[in-house]
Structure formats: structure tokens, C-alpha cells
Curated annotation (Swiss-Prot):
This is Large ribosomal subunit protein bL12. One of its GO terms (molecular function) is mRNA binding. It comes from Limosilactobacillus fermentum (strain NBRC 3956 / LMG 18251). The keyword Nucleotide-binding does not apply. One of its GO terms (biological process) is translation. The lineage of its organism: Bacteria, Bacillati, Bacillota, Bacilli, Lactobacillales. Belongs to the bacterial ribosomal protein bL12 family. It comes from the Bacteria. NCBIfam families: L12.
């Protein structure tokens, strides 16, 4: 069976909106499919990201300047030196949870400035 994609596209360009609507309905019935996007799945994921107001700052790697990263983590979290070192050594680990976007970006910038790898969740 010969399939001429360009001819089909040309025909679609010339068709009216109502003809295209009828075509979509016929294809849905013939192949038992739906042209509607999976709104419940895709909408939930996209809506969650757009409406997110609290973030978790995750240290993924301390990099080569581990001592500097420990000092920054200690200052940010208020942990003692031993606990801050354990947090950095245990990377990937959460540095701070449930923080606003601005604060999360500030923390990320401070950690990246001393060579750490950071992600926001």
C-alpha cells in the first residue's frame, strides 16, 4: 500500500474544521482510541510543579572542597561540626526541607559557590 504523507497533509490543510472534527471522531471509533490528552496524569504532574511552594535542598556531592562545604552546611543548618560533616559525608542527603523557593535558591547558590553539587526537589 502506497502511503503519501505529503498528499495527506495537503488534504488536511484544505479541509474545514468540521471535516477535521469528523475525521478525528472516525479515527477514534475505528481504532478505539481517544484524541484527548491524559489530563489526569499529565495535569497533576505539571500542576504540582507549577504550584510548588516548598522545596527540599539536596546535597548530591560535596565536590573537591569538602571542608568548605561542611562549613557552609554547618552555617545553613545550625548543626554542630560533627553532624554537618556526617550530613556531607552521607551525600546525597537533604540539607534543608520545606523551604521557600527564594531561600532554597540562596542555599543552592552558597553550596555551589564552594564546589558542591545541589538539586532542588
Amino acid at each position: 500500500m502506497a502511503f503519501d504523507k505529503d498528499a495527506i497533509i495537503a488534504s488536511l490543510k484544505e479541509a474545514s474544521i468540521s471535516d477535521l472534527n469528523d475525521l478525528v471522531k472516525a479515527i477514534e471509533e475505528e481504532f478505539d482510541v481517544s484524541a484527548a490528552a491524559p489530563v489526569a496524569v499529565a495535569g497533576a504532574a505539571g500542576g504540582e510543579a507549577a504550584a510548588k511552594d516548598s522545596f527540599t535542598v539536596e546535597l548530591t556531592s560535596a565536590g573537591s572542597a569538602k571542608v568548605k562545604v561542611i562549613k557552609v552546611v554547618k552555617d545553613i543548618t545550625g548543626l554542630g561540626l560533627k553532624d554537618a560533616k556526617a550530613l556531607v559525608d552521607g551525600a546525597p542527603s537533604n540539607v534543608k526541607e520545606d523551604v521557600k523557593e527564594d531561600e532554597a535558591n540562596d542555599i543552592k547558590a552558597k553550596l555551589e559557590e564552594v564546589g558542591a553539587s545541589v538539586t532542588l526537589k
